[in-house]
């Protein structure tokens, strides 16, 4: 499984049978994703203070477009690579939607439903 962070309202606009097309798809040609061990990295860097986020749990075998593991932008100092989805994300590829917010003391952590995967 791979994960994607987005606004709850953005995901709600994607009806069943629809496709999620964030701005990054037009801007850079792919949808930024993470895995269970790295979702906190982009969240901490880009989404501090946001209270409207969800974490999409995606089955990469159901996306129907290439998924490539590549360097982030900028590249992570430890060489961490991230999954990038090269096309729109079908609603049917999302197997879970989880509220995602900062924990007390700051920073993001996986929701408890995902923490032990």
Regions picked out by a protein language model, each given a short descriptive name:
Residues 1-117:
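Conserved, structured core segments of small domains
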